[in-house]
From Swiss-Prot:
An alpha-D-glucoside binds at Y109, K111, Y128, D135, D317. Ca(2+) binds at Q26, K62, K64, D328. Sequence repeats lie at residues 191-202, 210-221, 227-238, 244-255, 259-269, 273-283, 287-297. Belongs to the calreticulin family. InterPro entries: Calret/calnex, Calret/calnex_CS, Calreticulin, Calreticulin/calnexin_P_dom_sf, ConA-like_dom_sf. GO terms for biological process: ERAD pathway; protein folding; protein stabilization. Residues 207-251, 352-379 have a biased composition (Basic and acidic residues). It holds the Pfam family Calreticulin. A motif (Prevents secretion from ER) lies at residues 414-417. This is Calreticulin. It comes from Macaca fascicularis (Crab-eating macaque). GO terms for molecular function: calcium ion binding; carbohydrate binding; unfolded protein binding. Residues 18-197 are annotated as: N-domain.
Amino acid sequence: MLLSVPLLLGLLGLAAAEPAVYFKEQFLDGDGWTSRWIESKHKSDFGKFVLSSGKFYGDEEKDKGLQTSQDARFYALSASFEPFSNKGQTLVVQFTVKHEQNIDCGGGYVKLFPNSLDQTDMHGDSEYNIMFGPDICGPGTKKVHVIFNYKGKNVLINKDIRCKDDEFTHLYTLIVRPDNTYEVKIDNSQVESGSLEDDWDFLPPKKIKDPDASKPEDWDERAKIDDPTDSKPEDWDKPEHIPDPDAKKPEDWDEEMDGEWEPPVIQNPEYKGEWKPRQIDNPDYKGTWIHPEIDNPEYSPDPSIYAYDNFGVLGLDLWQVKSGTIFDNFLITNDEAYAEEFGNETWGVTKAAEKQMKDKQDEEQRLKEEEEDKKRKEEEEAEDKEDDEDKDEDEEDEEDKEEDEEEDVPGQAKDEL
């Protein structure tokens, strides 16, 4: 069967529009993940990941992911995929993070490595291409890292992107485009965007201060000056403190014993402080001198800042003080729309049910604590009542004893007689 040229071109166009999915991991095959993910042996005490949907979830099976399981540990785990380059195409990196342990200090980011990485020796100093994701440590650090390795140097973003710091699952997306622009999304909503060249210090500045320029000696930057016609009044200078005119030497003051009497000092009501001439507009004021700039001879544009020759490994290389973070729904693709749709079909489908389950657990815990508190108070009241009854019985016994002793006294006296 022969196809018409328009139809053939249409089919080719549809094929070209298909998204390229370089890596996708949802952990839907139970323990099958252990054959795809490799633990680093660089250190013997790396923390262990386990497959779990956590203490609360929207869908117990779909929400299963890699969970950190040991406190105060470094973690190093990675998965490889068919190597690719993002030259000439968009790169989208996406995954979900859930800090259900109410994390105090720890990473929730991923690293993209070239396929030359020795996965069994991956560690914190292993060279990567891109690092992306949330990082939390105390109240001061709650940011989304976006770090690019450019010519062997890790370059951090110049902006502060705040991450989510609650206990729920959140979707993190990094988009890097071939026009050297980028976008960061959290929960499929844009939180930052811009130019790679503007928001990272990849290149020397386009402009520099002219080294041959200097501020003229007669350049006056003072907006105000002292009024040369103003002078200090003759009666201005008064002491700040004066002897108290109302003070009197005590009658029992002995100058031989106490020394010469001096009245206490008080604030002088006529004291005016330091005199300063009034200010007037400076007739010679020229404004703040601005150093002129010239084109930087060291600057050279790089249209390929965004591009990497080789991506081949996604790794979790991080430190956590309190474990419990769950990573899931990893995706690396070249299609922004596909990534957004994938996020909606994973995180988007289960987020509401996850919150409902957490709210229900919190309510059950609240009621349990109220019941325990009520029971504790009742037990304390019962103990107090029992103590009061015992005290009353002791007092009655003491009174009976005293009465018995009083009755015995006359008989005792009679016997003595």
